[in-house]
Amino acid sequence: MRLILLGAPGAGKGTQAQFICERFDIPQISTGDMLRAAVKEGSELGLKVKEIMNSGGLVSDDIIIALVKERIAQPDCANGFLFDGFPRTIPQADAMKEANVKLDHVLEVAVDDEEIVTRLAGRRVHPGSGRVYHVDYNPPKEEGKDDVTGEALIQRDDDREATVRNRLSVYHEQTEPLVQYYREWAQQDPQTAPAYHRVEGTGSVEAIRQQVLTALEG
């Protein structure tokens, strides 16, 4: 089971990724984890990555693809893998195709922008414990206060509406074209292209999970 998980920030990919990885016994691979691991190992590629990151530069697609090929050759990828947040752009997807990285499925978790804004901008956190509330879906007993300690809840900078909308616009600009890319490839070349599935990311976690299973297992 070799798959890519696509979806906007706040679409609930993390919850589904965890379920898929447990179900099929595959690792979840993100570029951030790969880059950190390469730096830690101090391999030739890792030293290159460290140098680029220390100078504040962007790691090139060539290096990322080389890291991907190294990573998926590891023993824990024997049953497959799940790419989360990679590829991010069409050039990265093209580079994966050219590098002959085989994929079985591309799964898009689709959620309307306004629903995502409501989900994320409504989150409130208790800094001391990490307890998470939501002003609509899971409100504290007393507005703005943690149920256990009575201390003030905060809204993380990442969850502010302007920040959420900015992240969504970056997603639509850079990553959403991948949805079209994989959908068209699956239509044009069903023999070699990964199967493309779109799952509605609204409703209960269980209902979404069922859609995911139906898509991946048929």
From Swiss-Prot:
<keyword id="KW-0547">Nucleotide-binding</keyword>
<dbReference type="InterPro" id="IPR000850">
    <property type="entry name" value="Adenylat/UMP-CMP_kin"/>
</dbReference>
<feature type="region of interest" description="LID">
    <location>
        <begin position="122"/>
        <end position="159"/>
    </location>
</feature>
<keyword id="KW-0418">Kinase</keyword>
<dbReference type="InterPro" id="IPR006259">
    <property type="entry name" value="Adenyl_kin_sub"/>
</dbReference>
<dbReference type="Pfam" id="PF00406">
    <property type="entry name" value="ADK"/>
</dbReference>
<feature type="binding site">
    <location>
        <begin position="85"/>
        <end position="88"/>
    </location>
    <ligand>
        <name>AMP</name>
    </ligand>
</feature>
<keyword id="KW-0067">ATP-binding</keyword>
<dbReference type="InterPro" id="IPR007862">
    <property type="entry name" value="Adenylate_kinase_lid-dom"/>
</dbReference>
<comment type="function">
    <text>Catalyzes the reversible transfer of the terminal phosphate group between ATP and AMP. Plays an important role in cellular energy homeostasis and in adenine nucleotide metabolism.</text>
</comment>
<comment type="pathway">
    <text>Purine metabolism; AMP biosynthesis via salvage pathway; AMP from ADP: step 1/1.</text>
</comment>
<dbReference type="GO" id="GO:0004017">
    <property type="term" value="F:adenylate kinase activity"/>
</dbReference>
<comment type="similarity">
    <text>Belongs to the adenylate kinase family.</text>
</comment>
<feature type="binding site">
    <location>
        <position position="156"/>
    </location>
    <ligand>
        <name>AMP</name>
    </ligand>
</feature>
<keyword id="KW-0808">Transferase</keyword>
<comment type="subunit">
    <text>Monomer.</text>
</comment>
<dbReference type="GO" id="GO:0044209">
    <property type="term" value="P:AMP salvage"/>
</dbReference>
<feature type="binding site">
    <location>
        <begin position="10"/>
        <end position="15"/>
    </location>
    <ligand>
        <name>ATP</name>
    </ligand>
</feature>
<feature type="binding site">
    <location>
        <position position="167"/>
    </location>
    <ligand>
        <name>AMP</name>
    </ligand>
</feature>
<dbReference type="InterPro" id="IPR033690">
    <property type="entry name" value="Adenylat_kinase_CS"/>
</dbReference>
<keyword id="KW-0963">Cytoplasm</keyword>
<keyword id="KW-0545">Nucleotide biosynthesis</keyword>
<feature type="region of interest" description="NMP">
    <location>
        <begin position="30"/>
        <end position="59"/>
    </location>
</feature>
<feature type="binding site">
    <location>
        <position position="203"/>
    </location>
    <ligand>
        <name>ATP</name>
    </ligand>
</feature>
<protein>
    <recommendedName>
        <fullName>Adenylate kinase</fullName>
        <ecNumber>2.7.4.3</ecNumber>
    </recommendedName>
</protein>
<feature type="binding site">
    <location>
        <position position="36"/>
    </location>
    <ligand>
        <name>AMP</name>
    </ligand>
</feature>
<dbReference type="GO" id="GO:0005524">
    <property type="term" value="F:ATP binding"/>
</dbReference>
<dbReference type="InterPro" id="IPR027417">
    <property type="entry name" value="P-loop_NTPase"/>
</dbReference>
<feature type="binding site">
    <location>
        <position position="31"/>
    </location>
    <ligand>
        <name>AMP</name>
    </ligand>
</feature>
<dbReference type="GO" id="GO:0005737">
    <property type="term" value="C:cytoplasm"/>
</dbReference>
<feature type="binding site">
    <location>
        <begin position="57"/>
        <end position="59"/>
    </location>
    <ligand>
        <name>AMP</name>
    </ligand>
</feature>
<feature type="binding site">
    <location>
        <position position="123"/>
    </location>
    <ligand>
        <name>ATP</name>
    </ligand>
</feature>
<dbReference type="Pfam" id="PF05191">
    <property type="entry name" value="ADK_lid"/>
</dbReference>
<feature type="binding site">
    <location>
        <begin position="132"/>
        <end position="133"/>
    </location>
    <ligand>
        <name>ATP</name>
    </ligand>
</feature>
<feature type="binding site">
    <location>
        <position position="92"/>
    </location>
    <ligand>
        <name>AMP</name>
    </ligand>
</feature>
